[in-house]
């Protein structure tokens, strides 16, 4: 009768809710144990998929993809909207190899056809490195979103590295290189790391 049908429907509903809860719990548990989470949001998925890629194919990257990376860099937040960033796209083989030889953590430049040097204008802002760091992150995410691999290699605040980058990009005195980002098509498949750590989160007070 109708009462029995209602009881069955309620039981099925409770069962379905329980199963969904178990699936959700399992997904959260696996993510916390090392698996990168998958969401229904393309922007979040791209953030979680980003990884540092240090080996590249000897393959040309389309100009359109490079343009999107640079546009993404310029879409970064900037204090007082000053936008003190400058970008140098390096494709010269001699410059790439020379920087690879002189910079301690940029040896992958020998494999890369391209690198973007993210710079800041110290005459425009004392906090240029903050804005330029946001720009660099956007560039890395744009590379990931387009099937490219990239890695952040630091120049600032190391004077010896800054001097090397200045030498091969001919930067004027007011322009300081923050980082060099080699990029290209990844030579091998690489899985992103799961970096979420709940212990790093504090509420109201540390």
Whereabouts are the PLM-identified features?
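Short, Lys/Arg-enriched N-terminal segments with co-localized hydrophobic residues
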Residues: 1-6
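Acidic, surface-exposed loops and disordered segments
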Residues: 7-11, 15, 23-206
């Amino acid at each position: 009768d109708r009462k029995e049908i209602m009881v069955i429907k309620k039981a099925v509903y409770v069962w379905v809710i329980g199963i969904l809860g178990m699936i959700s719990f399992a997904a959260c548990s696996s993510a916390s144990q090392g698996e990168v989470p998958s969401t229904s949001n393309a922007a979040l998925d791209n953030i979680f998929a980003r990884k540092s890629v240090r080996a590249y194919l000897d393959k040309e990257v389309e100009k359109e993809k490079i343009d999107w990376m640079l546009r993404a860099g310029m879409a970064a937040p900037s204090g007082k909207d000053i936008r003190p960033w400058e970008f140098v796209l390096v494709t010269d083989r001699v410059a790439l190899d020379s920087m690879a030889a002189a910079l301690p953590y940029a040896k992958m430049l020998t494999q890369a056809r391209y690198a973007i040097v993210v710079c800041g204008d110290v005459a425009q802002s004392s906090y240029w490195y903050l804005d330029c760091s946001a720009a660099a992150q956007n560039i890395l995410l744009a590379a990931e979103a387009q099937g490219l691999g990239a890695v952040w290699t630091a120049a600032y605040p190391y004077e010896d590295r800054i001097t090397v980058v200045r030498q091969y990009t001919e930067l004027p005195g007011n322009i300081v290189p923050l980082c060099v980002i080699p990029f290209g098509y990844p030579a091998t498949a690489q899985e992103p790391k799961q970096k979420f750590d709940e212990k790093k989160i504090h509420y109201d007070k540390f």
